[in-house]
Amino acid sequence: GRIRRPLGAALSIGTTKITKSEGSNRSDTSGFETVDTIHRLKNKIQIWLPDLKYSDDLAAIKYSNAPNYFNTATTAIKTMYKQVGPYQIDENGLLKSGVIIRHLLLPNMLENTLRVIDWIADNFEPGQVLFSLMHQYIPCGRAAEYPEINRVVTAEEYQKVEQYLFNSG
């Protein structure tokens, strides 16, 4: 079997405060940025908050019209990490710098989420990045066109992912 590394403060991100203080700028991103865009922001952003929505490129195309999403997003995230390094928390418990990878759990897409978690565990050591698992998906807009995602995430789906996170380290 594969050895899994813990993801650090995987589910405790809600207790981490993110600051926008003097010298600490953050960037909420879709995760679908080009490396060139990230390079242009070097030394301007201390806290990156990229989304990593899909590990499945077919789902990325189907739901977001984003071909080559996973490769583009993971390359962007690695580039962000190279710029700011491991996350740093100051003496007041505030996040000063780092990368928080956000992932929204979607209904009927458990494998997508597990592969996102695996990618993070395979590419970062404990203490390097933070992970924010979000489960507040609310179907709206064109979601009605896709019955498989036209509902909220169940407690059972969330618990399975939560258990996977805790067992992965």
Predicted regions and their residues:
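A broad detector of short, well-ordered amphipathic alpha-helices
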Residues: N71-T74, Q159, Q163
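Flexible loop/N-cap segments at domain edges
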Residues: R151, E156, E162-F166
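Conserved AdoMet/S-adenosylmethionine-binding subsite of the radical SAM
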Residues: G1-Y146
